[in-house]
A protein has these predicted regions:
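A gly/Pro-rich, aromatic-decorated transmembrane alpha-helix motif that marks the paired
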Residues: 25, 63-64, 146-163
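Short amphipathic helix-loop junctions that connect adjacent transmembrane helices
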Residues: 25-46, 241-245
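Cytoplasmic membrane-interface "Motif A"-like loop-to-helix N-cap segments
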Residues: 71-83, 130-131
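C-terminal ends and interior cores of transmembrane alpha-helices
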Residues: 81-102
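Intracellular juxtamembrane helix-capping segments at the cytosolic ends
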Residues: 114-128
Length: 245
């Protein structure tokens, strides 16, 4: 069997994916819908440029969020902080005014950086002593990802188009908030997993770190390649999509 904590993570991730994909399903439609119908009347090119920039940044910030969790605040607090920021961001988009849309997207980018990498880190630490069960655990976990994505696209998309854009964005924000509350009030079920940053855990244990368990397994060449790829990707993001908006 699997620990009960896995199912807390399952539903937390499911509602986060509901919120994420629900908002994504609405964003381009909202931006390109005529002003008389409540949208912004953007061209497809401009709407997709903003969407692409947002999506790109969402996959960059987890590098920083994972580092902060490892070094300073621990996985569990990172998840809670990220979920709160994302809930505020999505709910602010329900105001459908330029300031709130841009602020909401920015908050979602920042919050996702804390949330995304640390959910899977908690699972990895939960199964540290039972690695043979880890594949099954991640299979169950990603079932929650798929379920949340499907429900979010269907429900938020329908509500946004048929009832109102603000209701669609608001629904995504409400479920993000529910996911955060569920995780926060059930987190004691994880015991000490993710409670402290990895650096503090290693220091407290006073155990020698084996070569395969080092916090930084990368060689100097690996780091150089990572930096080059990251800089090249960031330059492309800043010079291509933004130039079209």
């Amino acid at each position: 069997g699997h620990p009960a904590g896995l199912f807390v993570l399952f539903f937390t991730e499911m509602w986060e994916r509901f919120s994420y994909y629900g908002m994504r399903a609405l964003l381009v439609l909202f931006l390109t819908t005529a002003i008389m119908n409540g949208g912004w009347g953007w061209s497809n090119e401009n709407a997709l440029a903003l969407y692409g920039t947002y999506t790109s940044m969402v996959y960059l910030t987890p590098i920083l969020g994972g580092f902060i969790a490892d070094r300073y605040i621990g996985y569990r607090w990172a998840v809670v902080i990220g979920a709160i920021i994302m809930a505020i961001g999505t709910l602010s988009m329900a105001m459908i005014e330029p300031f709130y849309i841009y602020s909401g997207l920015t908050l979602l980018i920042v919050g996702n950086g804390f949330f995304k990498p640390n959910m899977t880190s908690i699972i990895s630490h939960m199964y540290k002593d039972h690695p043979e069960k880890k594949d099954g655990a991640f299979t169950i976990f990603y079932m929650g990802v798929n379920a949340g994505a499907f429900l979010g696209i269907m429900l938020c998309g329908y509500i946004g188009e048929k009832v109102g854009w603000n209701w669609g964005f608001g629904l995504a924000g409400i479920f993000m908030l529910l996911g955060m509350l569920q995780f926060y009030f059930a987190q004691n079920i994880f015991g000490d997993v993710g409670k402290k940053p990895v650096k503090a855990v290693v220091s407290d244990s006073k155990a020698e770190v084996k070569s395969e368990d080092k916090l930084n397994p990368f060689t100097s060449l690996d780091l150089i390649i990572i930096v080059i790829i990251s800089v090249a990707g960031l330059v492309w993001i800043l010079n291509d999509p933004y130039s079209k908006v």
